[in-house]
Amino acid sequence: MSYSNSIIFGPIPSRRFGISLGIDLSPGKKQCNFDCLYCELEGAKTVDKMDEYPSVENIINEIKNSFKTHHKIDVITLTANGEPTLYPKLDELINEINKIKANTKTLILSNGSTIYKKEIYDALLKIDIVKLSLDCISEKCFKKLDRVNNSVETQKIVPAMIDFSRQTKNDLVLEILFVKDLNDKIDEIELLNKAINQIKPKRVDIGTIDRPPAYQVKPVTYEFLEDVASEFKNINVNIVYKNRPKSMQTYSEDEI
C-alpha cells in the first residue's frame, strides 16, 4: 500500500460533523499500537510511538492555507494512518489549533488505547469532540481482534474513559466495530453494555466491516446490529451500515 504523504485531506462533507478538514498525523506510513484484523490499511507491526511525523509548524501552516481557500469548515478532524494520539507533540498541536480555529470545532478519531496516560487525557480534554473506539472489554478479545501492542494496558482503558466522560465539558462519542465470530458473542456484548452504561458517552456508533480488511475476517449482519442496539439500554445508539435496509435511530435530532 502506498501513502500520499499529504498532511491535509478534504474538506469533505460529513453527515454528522458538517464540512470536515482532515489532518493526517502519520501521512507517510502506518504507525499504530493496534493491528486490528478489520483495518482498511495493510497489516503492520504495532508500535508504541511514532518515529516519523510532520512538525506542528507544518501542520498549522497547512491548516491556515486551507482556511484561506475554504471559508466554510465546520470541523478540523485529527486522524492518522494509525493512531493519532501517538503523535508526540499532540498537546502542543491542539493548543496551536485552538488559537486559530475560531468557531471551527475540533474532532479526534482515536482507538482509545492511550486515554489512561495523563498527557493524552489532558490533551483530549481540549478537543471539542472526542471519538474513541471500544471494540472489546476482555483481554482475550483485545488480543485477538485489535492485536494490541504490549505497551497497551487494556485494563486501564475503560476506567479512564469513565473518568474522562465525567470530567470533559465537551462531546464524547464511542464507536464499536463488530466482527463475525470475534466480538459478537453474548459475553462480550454484555461486558460492552456494562462499560458503556458506566462511561455514559453522548452517542455510540455501532457498525461492521464495509471495506476490504487487512485480514480474512467477515462482517456481522444488519439484523445483528439491530439486536445489539436494542440490548444497549439508556444509550443513544447509531447504526452505521452500508446499504442499510432501513433507518434506525435512537438518538435525538440535536445529537452531533
PLM region descriptions:
Residues S2-R16, P27, N61, K68, ...:
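Auxiliary Fe-S-binding modules of radical SAM enzymes
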Residues L86-V220:
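Conserved AdoMet/S-adenosylmethionine-binding subsite of the radical SAM
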Residues P27, E42-K45, T79-A80, I176-F178, ...:
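Short, histidine-centered active-site or binding-site loop motifs used for metal coordination
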Residues E40-G43, K72-V75, I137-C141, L172-V173:
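Short, basic/glycine-rich phosphate-binding loops at helix/coil junctions
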Residues E42-L78, P88-E92:
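Conserved alpha-helical substructure of the radical SAM core
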Residues T77-E83, N111-G112:
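Glycine-rich beta-strand-to-loop/alpha-helix junction loops that act as flexible
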Residues R16-E57:
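Canonical Radical SAM [4Fe-4S] cluster-binding loop centered on the CxxxCxxC motif
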